[in-house]
Every structure is written in structure tokens, then in C-alpha cells.
Design a protein with these regions (language model features):
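PLP-dependent class I/II
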Residues: 1-185
Length: 185
């Protein structure tokens, strides 16, 4: 991908309309593994601030990065418009447990709590205990294993002549199939 799956002011602007209420920011990205650069984050920040949009930051792969990573939470002047979403399943290998949390300004949390009370009764106790224990776990050995696997698969794809962006996070590789006359449809 020419832009390395980064967000540019131009490609973001063409997708924002008068009906837009929020931007969903997924970094590291699923399925590309791209980690957004400070320039990409700045582009989102400028548009969100100018258009008074919420930014939902899907950070479920934030602990699974292979280099520099910056959280969107650094933009404190729009703090009331930022919702950080985190999961236990990806960083702690608890796939299928469907347990997570979010961080947001108090008025946002109060509104989300109302919604939550009508959609979820409670998390089962063993999930709560497992997630609490996971917070004491250091995921860096798992991240190093993912890095080795990423490097191996990436290297093999490149050796086979595939065009693929080396993922900066998560555990996905997203090869291009365009040169084979195929598209994603």
C-alpha cells in the first residue's frame, strides 16, 4: 500500500460528512498490523477537533507492538471526546473471553453506563478473576514470540515475491493480491 496504511488528512477528509459523529481509530490495525504514525494521529486530531467528533480508540492490540507506539490519549485538549477501548483477549491471550474495559471522561461514562445496564447483566466471576490476574502478567515474552513469527512469515512471503507491508503490531499480515489480477471483492 502506497501510504503504508496510514491516515492522511486527504483520505480522512473525503470520508467525513455532516452526519459523522465519531472516528474509529484502530491501532495497531486489524487486519493490516499498521501502527499509526504521529502524523496520522495528528490528522485525526485536527479533523476531530475541527468537526467536534468523538474518537473511539480501539487499543486492543496496543501491548502487541514491535516498535514505537503513541496513544491518541496524548491530545488532552479534546479529552472529553476520546474513548479508549481495551480488551483482555488479545494482549493476554484470552481469546473468546470477551472481556474488556474503556476509559473516557465522566459524562461519557455515565451515558455509556446507562446503555451497558440494558445490554449486559454482569461478567461471570471466573472471567473477572482471570482478567484481574492477567494485569500482573508481562506480555513481552508473548510479543517476542509474535515478532519472530511475523518476521518468519513476512520473510517467506517476500521470498515468494508477494507484496506485503511488514506489520508494526498485532499478529496479522496483509499481502497485496493486486499483481495477480485479484481484488478484495
Amino acid at each position: 500500500c502506497a501510504d503504508h496504511f496510514q491516515i492522511t488528512p486527504q483520505n480522512l477528509a473525503q470520508h467525513i460528512t455532516a452526519k459523522s459523529k465519531a472516528i474509529l481509530l484502530n491501532s495497531p490495525n486489524n487486519p493490516t498490523g499498521a501502527v499509526y504514525t504521529p502524523e496520522s494521529l495528528d490528522a485525526v486530531y485536527q479533523v476531530a477537533k475541527e468537526k467536534n467528533l468523538f474518537v473511539l480508540c480501539d487499543n486492543v492490540y496496543a501491548q502487541l507492538v514491535y516498535g514505537p507506539y503513541q496513544s491518541f490519549s496524548r491530545y488532552q485538549d479534546i479529552r472529553e471526546k476520546i474513548i479508549l477501548i481495551q480488551s483482555f483477549s488479545k494482549p493476554y491471550a484470552m481469546t473468546g473471553w470477551r472481556m474488556g474495559y474503556l476509559c473516557a471522561d465522566r459524562p461519557v461514562i455515565e451515558q455509556l453506563a446507562k446503555l451497558h445496564s440494558y445490554t449486559v447483566v454482569s461478567a461471570v466471576s471466573f472471567l473477572q478473576k482471570g482478567c484481574a490476574a492477567a494485569l500482573d502478567y508481562d506480555p513481552s515474552p508473548m510479543v517476542e514470540t509474535y515478532r519472530r513469527r511475523r518476521d518468519y512469515v513476512y520473510g517467506r512471503l517476500v521470498e515468494m515475491g508477494m507484496e506485503v507491508q511488514k506489520p508494526q503490531g498485532a499478529f496479522y499480515l496483509f499481502p497485496s493480491i493486486q499483481k495477480y489480477g485479484m481484488d478484495s471483492e
